[in-house]
Structure formats: C-alpha cells, structure tokens
C-alpha cells in the first residue's frame, strides 16, 4: 500500500505513524499541510477549505493547509480544544536536497506544553501534571514549562489529587498505560484535562530531582520529565529543582468547596470576575498575579508564617508613599519567569531581551525602596535581592534600543559592540550615501527634474523616468529593468556595482547580527537561576503590596488569631461589598467559641444566608493568606480545612443526582473534618422528601456536634430543627431578619439571635414570575394547611409531622385568617418597580445577583 504513494506522501505517513494522537503540521514551502484523516478533521475544527491532491494512488488524497506565518493562531485553536499538534519542519535546504527534502518533528505542542501565544494567560500558570498510582496512594508531579516551576506531592485519596489538579488548572495529565482507566476518566472529566500516555523508559534521575524522597515521587516526576523531553526536543535546563510539599502544610479546601466559594472563578461563567481572586488582585506584575492565585489556593496554617506576611502588609500600609512608588516600579517589571523560560527554550527575540533589560533597570530602586522601610524583615528582604547588574550591563552594551521582532532583519546589535559589524555598516552607509547623491547627479546630467532613484526587494535599485521624458536619456547609458504604466526603470553600470556592494554588506550585517544575537542569548542563559530567584522576590513583593493596597482602600482590619474563638464584628462579604455600594452593604457579626460551635441559620430564601456563610469562609481564607479582612474586628482560629455543601446541581458527567452530590459532599466533610475545621452546610436534605430531608439534617447536625466539634454553620428551611438548641449545648440559633411592608417582604440581611418564625416561599415564587393563577392556587392551599394544622386534608399526601416537635404549618404574611385576600392598591412607584421586576429573569441569575437586583428595587420603594 505504502509503495503506491509518492515519496513525499510516504515520508508523511512514516512520520505520522509516530504521532498518531496529534495533528501533523507537515511543512511544504510556505505552508503547513495536513493529509488524510488529519485534513478532514482539521478542516472541520478550523473551518478551512478541504481540498485534495494526487499522492500517487488511484484516489486523490484529502488535504488542507495553513500559511506558516499565521500557523500559531490555528495551532492555538486546536490546543484549546484539547488536541495535540506535531510541528514537522524541513531540516535541509530544498535547493541542496537530493530527492525528497528531509523533514522531522521538531516540537510536539500539547495543552500542557504551550509556551506562548494567546493560549497562555499572563497571570496564570500553565501546569502539566503527572499522576502515578501506588498501593497506599498517588504520586502527583506538576511542571510549568513557561516558568520552570516543578512541584511534587504524595496524596492518599484520589479526591485530593483531583482537588490539587483543579487548583492549578492543569490542562494535561500524563499517566502510564497501566493507570486505572476509570480513575483516568474521572481526572479527565472533573479536571477538564487532556490525558496523555507515557510508557517510555524513564531516564536516569536528573539533578533537579535527586533530592526527591522515595521511589513514588521520583517515578512520577521522571515520567513527566521524560514526556517533556519527547515533546519539546530541546533543552529543559531552566526547570527548577522539584519542590516537595505536603497537603497538611496548608489549609485543605476540596474541589467542590473551591468551586462553591468561587475562590478563583465564578460557578456560572467560569470567569475570574466575581471571584475572590478578582477582588484581591491589585498586583502589578504577571508573576505577582500567579503567586496570588497560588496563595489563595493554599492558605497557610502556621501562625508564624501568616504573621510574617501580616507584618509586611502592615508595614506597607503605614508607608503610603513608598508603597505607591513600589507599585509604579513593579509596573515596569515584565514577566521575568517566562522571559527566563523563553531564553532557555531558545525562542527569545531581541524585544524580549529589551523587556528583560527594562525590568532589571527597576530592581536597584526597588531594592533601595524596600530597604528603606522601617521593618526588620523588609530590610532582610532587600538584602537578599540580587539586581543582576552584570546582566544589565551586558544587555545595555549589546542590544539596539528598538530592535525588530524578526531576528533576520538586522538592527539588533548596537554600534560599537563588534568591530566587523561596524565595518559592514560603514560600507552599507557609504553606499547609500553615494546613491542619495546619485539622484541629484542624474537629474543634473539629464535635465529631468522628476527623475527618481529608488529600491524594492524584487528589482533592487533603479532609476525611474516618466515616459514623457524618455527622449532626454542618453542612448546606451541606461539599461531597462522594469516597465510601468507611466514610467520606465533603468540601471547603470555604476549603480549596478554599488548595488552589489550594498546588498552584500547588508546581507553580511544581517548574518553577523544573528550570530552575535545567538551568542548573546547563550550568555544570558547563564543567568537563568539568578533571574528565577529575582522573579520570586519580585512576585512576593507584588503580592504583599497587593494585600496592603486592597486592605487600605477597602478599610480592612488586621485579624487576630485565637485557639478556638470566632469573633467577627461587622463583617462583610468581600466580593458582594465590592459589587454593591459600600454604604449599602449590611455588615453582620459572627460569634462562635467553646460553648457555641454550631450556628443553625434560618430565614427566607434569598435573604442572605448563603452569603453570610460564604462570608465567614472567605474571611478565614483571607486571614490565612496574610491579607487583612473586611470587618470592624476579627478574631479567628486557624482552620486546617474548609468544607462546604452549598448549591444544588446534578453531576451529569458521573450520572449523580443533586441529592447524591449533596450526600457525597456531606460525607466528605463528616469523614475528613476535625475539630479545627470549618464546615458550611446549606440546606442539607432539601433534595429528598420532607421527612427524609429533615431526618438526615438532624442526624448530620447531631453527628457533627457530638463526634467532630468543628465550627459549623448550618442553614435550613426545616424550622422544626430550631428546637435542637435546647438539646445540643454547642448549637445556637440565628436568623436573617425580614419584615413585611405594604404587602411586600423586605429582606434586611441582618443576622440576629434566635430562630426565624416565618417563611416566604410564595413571595419568592412571585419574584421568580411564576404564573399568577399558580401563585393564587398556592395561597389557597396554604390557607387550607393553616386551617387543618398538621393534618392537611389532601388525598394521597402523607401526613406531615415534625421530626423534632409538632408545630402548626408555616404561616404566610399574605394570608389574613379566613378573610378573602384582596389585591392591595398599587401606587405609580410600585407599578414601576413591578415592571422592573418583570423585566428581570431571575432564573438566569445567581442568588447573589438576584439579591443585589432586589436590593436596588427595594431602595426605590423607600
């Protein structure tokens, strides 16, 4: 079969056989071509024309292609969709080739190995992960080619592996073919990553991995390193020593809780805006932005480490002018980590090195500024900063101030840096000066005032004369070179001679400049470890000034840490406060301690229960990353873990219902929480029948109270459960206040002691714009239930009885005894508000967005 194809197609098929899982971009002249199934699939994914060509067989071969100069955009599209792309280049000059031009794959681009382009967000890492399965757990290794960072951790539970991979947003996971298929499928679906198989012989342990403890982490990282070697086919010298960490060194937040709390992205839109990261991000560098995300993902649990950050933040708050100067300096610092990575990979251009030079210019001032702060640790930080002055001198001496993007156009190297280059430039300049004089000489010689001397890349130098003046030219002196519509272009023997000298000089200039730049690039490589250390120092300073800036601008307070007490006075949800006018936000207290470990929260839907619960979790996270918190006063314990059961959504991927997801998340907290954990349970049990739900809710409350003792906020609509306050000494009731005003429920968003005594379900249904006749029917049914107490006269409906105590059914503000309800008179202002309500599609909004809209409309009624 192979023999029936042309030699070039045979070459293609041979290379493609080695890269079956990737699109093969096969270089043909100025295009990357794809053939056969690759072409069919690429034409669909990239929306490009599918054609065909003769390949030597009876049938024509499907083909499509993209121009090499714009290939990056097409490659990016494929990578975003989870595909891999193998770049196959011509490795010999076609003019010198005997037979088919030699080609080979020079790089395999995968979702986890993208080095540049729009596929890389400047404030996010691009980690690739490797997971290995062992008898007692899993090895996890992470590497970011763009920054050189490497991490490794041994984890007992696969759920924690998924949480770590989710935290770092790894786009690709490398496993062996023996890895459990079901587990691999879970990793792919829950983490949204591409799974890649690596079964190659693992190379000998390299220098950056020699310190790894145990065979588990060594095997896991070396599998990842082997995969990177195979795909990148170039030096990986910029990779830093593997940093080994343990989950217990930081606050543990499982995958679901990270999503529920919207730490780095929102649940609905998956965007940064609206998340805690969005709120806090006052960083000025890409490096600082990445470090901030890492800090949010892994809050500290050692008081000494937290307090060290707090002290630096407080110092920067107290030095306003120095902080503002620091922010301005950091703004001029480019991404040192990724610049170092580009240097190591050999794809750095002159403009990148100019960015490096401009960044290094800022470092001495930053070092001096930090050293001037009145704080011992700040002075120690300043003392450790290496400005890399020798590298700055080298770049200042060698690089042209405004080089082109291309490395083949010249103008890269400064005058005076290299003697031979200066000689070539003098030759080129002298020749061009001669040509500039030639135009005046020829005009004088011929008497043609419109005569021009010009140049283009196709025809070189020429003398242009309009056709009306051709009769003035001397016969035999001018050789025709090009005919235009209204003019002729000529060359003379003297011009031809100078052209050869100039073009030779310019060609020599470009070649020599490229050689000098390559040498310069190799010299810069020697500075990579120092640049990486400097990048780490700059990113830490940036993250700390970010905390100081947000804390001062938003009037946050420094939290104090306690053994067991929670005392938040006038606390605010940081993100909600930002999206609302700060004067409108209703702050709330949270008091918990030795005799108050659990809060049972009751109140209407959309009154702010979930916001209040998230608020406490976010304040705790902010405190443990070293930031100040939105409160008048904050005393907090150091939590080892945070668990949340908030929201309701079916897990369609794994075929789990809302209630099953709810129970699994509850189990995760119950099994893994300690007395030092924080648990948020929102509406546990609502996904099943009333009796089942109430029974489960009560049992969970009792279990957490009696067996775990963790700080727990438990919101519920089962008002019957509020009697547990009398039976469980650590449980206290609180509720969200709501009042009726002119037939309208006003949510006050205030947390008060005690249990709520009313529900507003029908009111919320009205806000959701359910049909009027449905609302009326609900009110009729509710009236009947109120009249019959706990024995509703409804056929085929189980008799409802409290799991804890018997109480009458919930009352409605909208029912008035047995009197027939009448529609109240509505004012013009109320009509306007009602119309505004009708235009809002609450079902497409998050609870937070809906609450904000309701609050705005409520203000109009006041």
Swiss-Prot record:
Source species of the chain: Bacillus velezensis (strain DSM 23117 / BGSC 10A6 / LMG 26770 / FZB42) (Bacillus amyloliquefaciens subsp. plantarum)
Pfam families associated with the record: MutS_I, MutS_II, MutS_III, MutS_IV, MutS_V
Functional summary from the UniProt entry: This protein is involved in the repair of mismatches in DNA. It is possible that it carries out the mismatch recognition step. This protein has a weak ATPase activity.
Superkingdom of the organism of origin: Bacteria
Gene: mutS
GO biological process, one term: mismatch repair
UniProt-annotated binding residues for ATP: 603-610
Family to which this protein belongs: Belongs to the DNA mismatch repair MutS family.
Protein name, per record: DNA mismatch repair protein MutS
Taxon lineage: Bacteria, Bacillati, Bacillota, Bacilli, Bacillales
GO molecular function: ATP binding; ATP-dependent DNA damage sensor activity; damaged DNA binding; mismatched DNA binding
Annotated Gene Ontology cellular component terms: cytosol
Keywords, in A-Z order: ATP-binding, DNA damage, DNA repair, DNA-binding, Nucleotide-binding
PROSITE patterns linked: DNA_MISMATCH_REPAIR_2
